Structures are given as structure tokens and as C-alpha cells.
Amino acid sequence: MANRYWKKALTVLVLGAFVIMGLSSLALAQQAQWMMDAHKMMEDGWKMYNDGQRMVIQGKEMNDQVAVQAGFQDKMVQGDKVIQDGRNTATQGATLFAQGEKTFTDNLTNPSVAQKGLKMMMDGFHMTTDGSDMMAKGVTMNNQVAQAAGATEKFTQGNQVINTGQDTMANGAKLFLQGETIVLKNQQ
């Protein structure tokens, strides 16, 4: 009789262990899914943002050529310095983003480390947006120089490229922030 009791108890324990393992596997799968969804949105948003940033730089270079031809590039030194500082900040942010992405992808089986990678990606993105804000300020400064030199119309084409780039960056930022919201909602 006692032997049968122990067999039943052992059976219940084994079944309980399987249920617990199944539930924990389900929880891990759900955690992995939201992390993958967030990563995908953040990665796609980053790519779009980066494409927009390249357009802004291209438009700035177009305006630089106009300024050289019109003879007032030396008056754009302050704006160019702010733009360069912004590019440097954005580059540091991109480096942190890349480190975070590598940390995430290298540690998919370790959720706590993978989450740290997502956090690094978020920090890198925000650093990059700070740099982009600085670049926008420098572009505005250079546009004021062009206006004072009577060359606003000559900056039109470069500024169109810059505006398209800024719109692309804004759309990329929206997508990135949707992924970030998923991370913040599920953080442990």
C-alpha cells in the first residue's frame, strides 16, 4: 500500500514537473517573440533613419558646392562645425547601436543578455537622434548664411534633398519607437 502511494506521488511529481517545464517553455517562447518583434521594428526603423541621414548629408554637400561657387563657404564655418559635431555624435550612437545589435543576436538563448542588447540599441538610437538634431541646427545656420548672401534660391535643390531625408528619418524614428515601446512594456 505504501509502495503504491509513493508511485502515485512520484507520478504526480513527474507530471507536475512536465507541466512546469511546458509553462516555462511557453513563457520563454513568448518572451523571445516580443524581443524578436521589437528587434525587427527597431532594426527596420534604424535602416530607414540611416537612409534619411545619408540624404541629409548629401543635401548638405550639394549646398556646400553652391556656397563654394558663390564664394561664401567661409561664412558657413559655424554651421559646418555644428553639423560635424552632430555627425560625430551620430557616429558614436551608431557604434553603440551596432554593439547592441550584436549583443542581442549573439545572445538569443539568454534573454537577460539579449535585453541588454536591445537597451544598447535604444541608447545608441537616441544618441544618434541627438546628433541629427545638431546637424539640423547646423543646416539652419547655413541656410541663414545663404539667405544673407542672397543665395537661398540656389540652396533649393540641396534643401529638398535635406527635407526628404528628414522626412525619411522621422518615419524611421516612428518605427523604431514602436519597437522601443514593446521593449519598455515588457522589461523585467
Residue map of PLM features:
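Immediate post-signal-peptide N-terminus of mature secreted/exported proteins
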Residues: S25-R87, T91, I182-Q188
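Charged heptad-repeat coiled-coil "stalk" segments of single-pass membrane proteins
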Residues: A98-G131, G138-N142, A148-G150, T156
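Asp/Glu-rich intrinsically disordered low-complexity tracts
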Residues: D37, D44, D51, D64, ...
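Bacterial N-terminal signal peptides
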Residues: V12-G22
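Mid-chain, structured segments of secreted extracytoplasmic proteins
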Residues: A70-K116, M120
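C-terminal amphipathic alpha-helix
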Residues: M35-A38, Y49, Q58, D130-Q188
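Bacterial N-terminal signal peptides that target proteins for export
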Residues: A2-L13
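Hydrophobic alpha-helical segments of integral membrane proteins
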Residues: I20-M21, L26, F97
